[in-house]
């Protein structure tokens, strides 16, 4: 009872095809792929921006004998 037979999966596949149609499924998968690609690009851009900020850091030396 815990596992599904091949007939169960064929019925599920038929229902999905009826709901979405043949042309809609590749379109949805293409949109998912574009989303993943944009997410990865955004993460790499964010890492590059963080690295640039750490490189641009400046230090200020002060003299300890000066009194305010």
From Swiss-Prot:
The keyword Transmembrane applies. Part of the twin-arginine translocation (Tat) system that transports large folded proteins containing a characteristic twin-arginine motif in their signal peptide across membranes. TatA could form the protein-conducting channel of the Tat system. Gene3D superfamilies: 1.20.5.3310. Belongs to the TatA/E family. It is found in: Cell inner membrane. Residues 48-68 are annotated as: Disordered. One of its GO terms (biological process) is protein transport by the Tat complex. The chain crosses the membrane at residues 1-21. GO terms for cellular component: TAT protein transport complex. This is Sec-independent protein translocase protein TatA. InterPro entries: TatA/B/E, TatA/E. Keywords: Cell inner membrane, Cell membrane, Membrane, Protein transport, Translocation, Transmembrane, Transmembrane helix, Transport. The keyword Flavoprotein does not apply. GO terms for molecular function: protein transmembrane transporter activity. It is a single-pass membrane protein. It comes from the Bacteria. Residues 53-68 have a biased composition (Basic and acidic residues). HAMAP family: TatA_E. The Tat system comprises two distinct complexes: a TatABC complex, containing multiple copies of TatA, TatB and TatC subunits, and a separate TatA complex, containing only TatA subunits. Substrates initially bind to the TatABC complex, which probably triggers association of the separate TatA complex to form the active translocon. It comes from Sinorhizobium medicae (strain WSM419) (Ensifer medicae).
């Amino acid at each position: 009872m815990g596992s599904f037979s091949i007939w169960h999966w064929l019925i599920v596949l038929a229902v999905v095809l009826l709901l979405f149609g043949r042309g809609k499924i590749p379109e949805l998968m293409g949109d998912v792929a574009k989303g993943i690609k944009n997410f990865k690009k955004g993460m790499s851009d964010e890492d590059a921006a963080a690295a640039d900020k750490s490189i641009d850091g400046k230090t200020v030396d002060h003299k300890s004998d000066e009194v305010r």
